[in-house]
């Protein structure tokens, strides 16, 4: 997948969800950072069904004469990664930078990612230095990163940071993938030949609250487990085999104890038997739930419904485009 051509055009893709308070500063700083590169660029902002004035602000920014902003407006909220994929469908650049709209990852880091990619890398990841998140978020991030590394074998250490750079060849490969559950950094790494990570700054969130609460992090964990690997299913098979052997051994033990100690011992051991039985029943329900997750994902993929629906695409000096994806 490697493409060693010098980067001429940079596309910055930013998903936006209820970020009206930070958009003005985001646009100002991102444009300044891109101007400093001395390359052609565009800034593609994807409104993911915001309920505040975010979509209106993006539309106004894109309609200014000579604006390099492209506003992609989704009709409702589809999630961060679906919004980014919608942005990927409207890029022109040789290199694509993804960036969150909350300004925790400074836009001023964009030139450094472009410089690293210009050395011939397909994907440039980032590692957040001196993270300004809560203890819970840091621990959850470490757990998720560890899970990803073990299941994918990829050594990148901070998959939660969306400030990343992708060659256009990698973007095209990802757009050919139609699975519903998409975790972009992992998907990109599966197509990349050369990857690198660089340290970047991390700032406190100044406006609003994080869109990843406890339940969203739990859902993300389930998504990662079931969309990355079938290892949990293999583990369940091994666990089931071990349980069957232990159950057989326990049955033999009960028979021997009854023959040795008499029927009175067997009656007293009934509660132990029930305790073990409930443990096995609980394990079965866990296995059934995990299997259901896989079957549900297969069902969603077979239906082949679109990841998102685009309401409008707004560019400078062009009428709004209405289309479905």
Curated annotation (Swiss-Prot):
EC number: 2.4.2.53
Keywords for the protein's UniProt record, in alphabetical order: Antibiotic resistance, Cell inner membrane, Cell membrane, Glycosyltransferase, Lipid A biosynthesis, Lipid biosynthesis, Lipid metabolism, Lipopolysaccharide biosynthesis, Membrane, Transferase, Transmembrane, Transmembrane helix
Main location group: membrane
One function term, GO molecular function aspect: undecaprenyl-phosphate 4-deoxy-4-formamido-L-arabinose transferase activity
GO biological process, one term: response to antibiotic
Catalytic activity from the UniProt record: UDP-4-deoxy-4-formamido-beta-L-arabinose + di-trans,octa-cis-undecaprenyl phosphate = 4-deoxy-4-formamido-alpha-L-arabinopyranosyl di-trans,octa-cis-undecaprenyl phosphate + UDP
Ranges that cross the membrane: 236-256, 270-290
InterPro entries linked to this entry: ArnC_tfrase (IPR022857), Glyco_trans_2-like (IPR001173), Glycosyltransferase_2 (IPR050256), Nucleotide-diphossugar_trans (IPR029044)
General function of this protein: Catalyzes the transfer of 4-deoxy-4-formamido-L-arabinose from UDP to undecaprenyl phosphate. The modified arabinose is attached to lipid A and is required for resistance to polymyxin and cationic antimicrobial peptides.
Similarity section: Belongs to the glycosyltransferase 2 family.
NCBIfam families tied to this protein: PRK10714.1
Protein name: Undecaprenyl-phosphate 4-deoxy-4-formamido-L-arabinose transferase
The organism's taxonomic lineage, starting at the top: Bacteria, Pseudomonadati, Pseudomonadota, Gammaproteobacteria, Enterobacterales
């Amino acid at each position: 997948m490697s493409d060693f051509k010098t980067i001429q055009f940079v596309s910055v893709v930013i998903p936006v969800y209820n970020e009206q308070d930070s958009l003005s500063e985001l646009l100002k700083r991102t444009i300044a950072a891109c101007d400093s590169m001395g390359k052609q660029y565009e800034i593609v902002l994807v409104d993911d069904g915001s309920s505040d004035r975010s979509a209106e602000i993006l539309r106004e920014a894109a309609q200014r004469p000579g604006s390099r902003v492209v506003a992609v407006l989704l009709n409702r909220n589809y999630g961060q990664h679906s919004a980014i994929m919608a942005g990927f469908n409207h890029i022109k650049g040789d290199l694509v930078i993804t960036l969150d709209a909350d300004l925790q990852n400074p836009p001023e880091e964009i030139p450094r990612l472009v410089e690293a990619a210009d050395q011939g890398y397909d994907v440039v990841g980032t590692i957040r230095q001196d993270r300004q998140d809560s203890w819970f978020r840091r621990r959850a991030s470490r757990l998720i990163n560890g899970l990803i590394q073990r299941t994918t074998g990829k050594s990148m250490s901070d998959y939660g940071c969306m400030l990343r750079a992708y060659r256009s060849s990698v973007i095209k490969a990802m757009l050919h993938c139609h699975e519903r559950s998409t975790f972009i950094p992992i998907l990109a790494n599966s197509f990349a030949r050369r990857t690198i990570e660089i340290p970047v700054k991390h700032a406190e969130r100044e406006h609003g609250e994080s869109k990843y609460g406890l339940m969203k992090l739990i859902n993300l964990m389930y998504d990662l487990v079931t969309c990355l690997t079938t290892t949990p299913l293999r583990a369940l098979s091994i666990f089931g085999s071990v349980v069957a052997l232990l159950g057989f051994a326990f049955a033999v033990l009960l028979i021997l104890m009854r023959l040795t100690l008499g029927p009175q011992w067997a009656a007293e051991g009934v509660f132990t038997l029930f305790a073990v039985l409930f443990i096995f029943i609980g394990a079965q329900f866990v296995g059934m739930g995990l299997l259901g997750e896989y079957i549900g994902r297969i069902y969603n993929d077979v239906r082949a419904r679109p990841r998102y629906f685009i309401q409008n695409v707004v560019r400078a000096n062009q009428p709004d485009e209405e289309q479905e994806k």
